[in-house]
């Protein structure tokens, strides 16, 4: 009997240790700020932090970094250093598992530090940019308290002190600090009127856009409105009101404000190839602001580009080729990833589809340079294809008299749908991370109003936590469509 009690006590102790090894996180929240105003306002702070940031900020940052598309590497891991431990983040369950015990932060004053380990620096850049914007999304107009900076020295320290399974490419350092906050002031004004002024605040919401972020490879070949092209170019590498170290800041960070991609971004469309500029001629004064195009080659080079890199989507009307000077330099290769995230998010906000092609192999790189007439100093690192969604595979514009609405009830919520014509419908509720949590089987519905009751439980019958969710009603008919509505579940 004594042995049985000892065994039970031992197993209980093991269970307590196992439980202590897992740290739960609060669900991500929706801050309500647009992707554009956050991009226009962001800047990096290197010091002066305090360690007082809420777990909600950490939750949103980790969730955002894990939401970026993979570039088909064999591994991707997120490490978190707090004053307590170093953790390995589990995106599927949104929890942190203790990886190394004890305080191993690079900066003793930081609230937390997040490291990304992937095969390619381009993909690391995608995640780093997502995390930075997720922190800045907590700002308000004119003020903020979440400060951050990607630090290469922190990455070096992490690789020596965090015992990662794979080499950590970069570390985002976060802390609390008074910052200037959100601003929609536009400084990206073309000096020669070759590009219209971009919009620095829109009706979209950063977290909502990110929750549905995905890549596509089938496009309608119709040309894009030029205002959309201008918006994409600005979102990727456009100037902003901030002036770090006397240089005009951009929508993305750059190591020591070196701005490695200056004069190295090219727009490829039906009329020719243009170089994008964000500085006044001759592009050497980094304190200046511009937003213009310079013609490089005339005539349609898109087929030549597709032949040079057959992996590119074949029907995209527009390609943006992001080049670097040194494809072997880690800091340089992070920036195409920063820019790539911006392109994907801005395309999504505009109702467009996009796809990043990376990495670019050396033979593809040389072929692209020859096809587009690029100088030897500009080596393609990422190609972004963008266009309207192909009508054959995604929803067309739905009738104005069709909608999906949400109403609260005593038991939970009621999802009301109005159909202009009959169709087979399937309703799915997703959490903020884009995971399906409750679904109703496909049913044939006539035209008119229909109701779906939801008591807030998942498919397994477990009650789900309060917070934002999204309902999508998929309609299969001659013209398939998708109706979407936000659900605020309250307990």
Residue ranges and their predicted role:
Residues 4-14:
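Sec-dependent N-terminal signal peptides
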Residues 42, 61, 78, 112-157, ...:
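Small-aliphatic-rich amphipathic alpha-helix that forms the alpha element of a beta-alpha
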Residues 419-424:
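Short proline/glycine-enriched turn/loop motifs at strand-loop junctions of beta-rich domains
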Residues 159-182, 372-390:
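A glycine-rich helix N-cap at a beta->alpha junction
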Residues 391-401, 406-416, 439, 443-447, ...:
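C-terminal tail/sorting-segment detector
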Residues 21-114, 147, 155-156, 160, ...:
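N-terminal amphipathic, basic helical "cap/leader" segment at the start of enzyme domains
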Residues 430-437, 469:
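Short, glycine-anchored, charge-dense loop/turn motifs used at functional sites
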Residues 15-20:
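Sec/Tat signal peptide C-region and signal peptidase I cleavage site
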């Amino acid at each position: 009997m004594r042995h049985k009690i000892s065994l039970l006590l031992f197993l209980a102790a093991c269970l307590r240790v196992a439980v202590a090894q897992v740290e739960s996180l609060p669900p991500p929240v929706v801050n309500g700020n647009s992707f554009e105003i956050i991009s226009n306002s962001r800047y990096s702070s290197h010091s002066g932090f305090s360690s007082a940031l809420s777990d909600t900020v950490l939750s949103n940052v980790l969730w955002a970094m894990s939401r970026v598309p993979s570039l088909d590497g064999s591994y991707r891991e997120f490490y978190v250093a707090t004053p307590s431990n170093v953790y390995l983040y589990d995106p599927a369950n949104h929890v942190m598992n203790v990886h190394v015990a004890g305080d191993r932060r690079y900066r003793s004053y930081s609230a937390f530090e997040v490291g990304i380990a992937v095969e390619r620096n381009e993909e690391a850049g995608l995640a780093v940019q997502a995390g930075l914007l997720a922190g800045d999304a907590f700002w308000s107009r004119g003020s903020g308290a979440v400060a951050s900076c990607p630090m290469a020295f922190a990455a070096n320290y992490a690789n020596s002190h965090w015992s990662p399974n794979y080499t950590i490419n970069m570390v985002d350092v976060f802390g609390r600090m008074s910052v200037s906050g959100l601003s929609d002031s536009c400084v990206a004004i073309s000096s020669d009127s070759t590009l219209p002024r971009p919009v620095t605040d829109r009706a979209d919401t950063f977290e909502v856009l990110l929750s549905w972020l995905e890549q596509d490879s089938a496009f309608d070949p119709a040309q894009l409105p030029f205002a959309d092209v201008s918006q994409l170019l600005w979102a990727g590498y456009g100037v902003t009101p901030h002036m770090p170290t006397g240089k005009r800041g951009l929508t993305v960070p750059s190591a020591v404000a070196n701005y490695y991609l200056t004069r190295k971004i090219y727009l490829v469309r039906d009329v020719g190839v243009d170089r994008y500029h964000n500085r006044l001629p001759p592009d050497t004064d980094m304190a200046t602001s511009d937003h213009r195009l310079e013609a490089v080659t005339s005539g349609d080079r898109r087929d030549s580009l597709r032949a040079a890199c057959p992996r590119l989507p074949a029907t995209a009307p527009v390609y943006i080729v992001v080049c670097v000077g040194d494809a072997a330099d880690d800091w340089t290769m992070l920036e195409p990833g920063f820019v790539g995230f911006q392109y994907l998010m801005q395309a999504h906000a505009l109702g467009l589809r996009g796809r990043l092609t990376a990495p670019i192999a050396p033979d593809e790189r040389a072929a692209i340079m020859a096809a587009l007439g690029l100088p030897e100093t500009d080596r393609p690192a990422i190609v972004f294809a963008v266009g309207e969604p192909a009508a054959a595979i995604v929803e067309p514009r739905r009738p104005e008299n069709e909608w999906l609405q949400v109403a609260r009830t005593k038991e939970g919520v009621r999802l009301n749908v109005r159909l202009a014509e009959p169709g087979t419908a399937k309703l799915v509720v997703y959490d903020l991370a884009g995971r399906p949590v409750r679904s109703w089987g496909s049913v044939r519905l006539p035209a008119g109003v229909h109701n779906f009751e939801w008591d807030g439980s998942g498919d397994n019958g477990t009650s789900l936590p309060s917070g934002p969710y999204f309902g999508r009603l998929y309609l299969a008919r001659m013209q398939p469509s998708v109706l979407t509505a936000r659900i605020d579940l309250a307990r």
